[in-house]
Amino acid sequence: MTGAPIVSARGVTRRFGGLVALDGVDLDVPSGIVQAIIGPNGSGKTTLLNALSGASHADAGSIRIGGAEIFRLKPHRIARLGLSRTFQNIRIFGDLSVLENVKVAAACHVRSSLFDIVVAGARQQATESDIEERARQALDLVGLAHRADDRARELAYAQQRLLEIARALASEPKVMLLDEPAAGMNTAESMTLLETIGKLKARGITILFVEHNVRLVMGISDRIAVLDFGKKIAEGTPSEVQRNPLVIEAYLGRRHRHA
C-alpha cells in the first residue's frame, strides 16, 4: 500500500447494548484510491461509515482525516475537514429542482463571517455565482446536467442516487463516503455508477464505499477491507481478498450452515 493515509482508524469500537457492532477495527485509506468495505449483513459496514462521518459516534478508538483527529466531532465539523457522504436511503428535496438540490448542499459549506452578512453586495453575488458554478460542475460530472431544471422527484431512482453523489461532490470533498450506492440499480445503471466513481477518483477524491454488488466492488476498487461480526478479517487488493480463506468462509460457510 502506497501513499500516506488520508483516513486512519485505530481500535474503533461501537456497542449497542450487549451487541458489539464494531470490535477494535483498524483501517488506513491512502489518498486518491477507491477503498471498498464489504462483509455479510450485520458485519458493521454502515456502522463504520457512521463512525467515520460522525453520524453515530464510536465508543472508543481514534479516527483521523488528513491527520486531524475527528473522534466525537460533530458531522458539520468533520465535513469542513473535507469529508462528505451519501446514505443508504436517498435524502433529496423532491420539490426542489435538481440544480437547487445541489446548490443547497454547496451553500451549506460556504463560510460567511458577520461582515459578509452585513456587507453583502458584490461579495454575496460572487458567492452565489461560485455556488451555481460548483453545482453545475457536479451535475455535469454525474451526467445530470441536462436535468438541472427538472424537479428532483421526477428523476428515476438511479438518477436520484447520482444526484446524491452530486450533492456530496458540491462541498468539494477530499474524501467521499458512499453507503451502498448501487442498491436497487440494474446492470446498466451500475455501470454508469462505476464510471462516475472513476471520474471522482480522477479528480483526486478518495472514495470509501460500502457495497453488496461484488462484481462492482471487484471492478472499481483498489483495495478492499472485509468485516465480519464487527471485526476486520481481511484487507488487500481485489484478487487477494477473493483468495482469502477467511473471506470465503464468511460468505460461503455461513450460507451452507443455514441452508
Walk through the language-model features, giving the residues of each.
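Glycine-rich phosphate-binding loops of nucleotide-dependent enzymes
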Residues: 2-259
